[in-house]
Amino acid sequence: MPGPARPVIAKFQRALLAWYARHGRDLPWRRTRVPYRVLVSEIMLQQTQVERVIPKYRQFLRAFPSLRALAAADVAEVRRLWYPLGYNIRPVRLHAIARETMARYGGRLPDDAETLRALPGIGRYTAGALLSFAYGRDAAILDTNVRRVLGRVFFAPRSLKRLRGDRRFWQLAEWLVPAGRAYDFNQALMDFGATWCTPRAPRCGRCPMRGFCARNRTCRNGHAGP
């Protein structure tokens, strides 16, 4: 797949980062670069709304303030503290990550994608989030919100329908990350998809991407498609 033209990439990066400077959300896990805290937030946010995660994130870190504290805890207690976020395999996996990290890496979460993804419950997205949000690496992320934004901006409706899987989206996400700005750029992508380029009633009329968005031409009455 040929990538977007460099001028389009630059426009997208500038528009998104400018939007984020004005509209980015103030979330508690964005006030830290501690890998453990970033990990907790990312695992909690899987399939769970931000508003539900915020109080539980704070409560969980009061109970288990470090990877060492979590690894030393009984898994039943970890699951109890997790309730009622749901998807109860997540606290079990988080506990397993803590124990394996203590046993194999001296309590320091790895800082390379391959080793991170070998840990239980860490996939490509979570590894990218840890690398960009905790370690300052130029790593891409791809979740539901990011996929929707990229699909609308860069793919015409017909070509989007022909896509299968996420391979091309990951490739595009990697092309788009601006050198040295992955932290802000990735946070901006998630916020933009969650609050602006939403599944229903996206704000196409006020969108900073409207001058070059492939979907903007077909966005009518708040319906931008997938």
Which residues does each PLM region occupy?
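Catalytic cores of DNA base-excision repair glycosylases
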Residues: 3-10, 14-15, 19-222
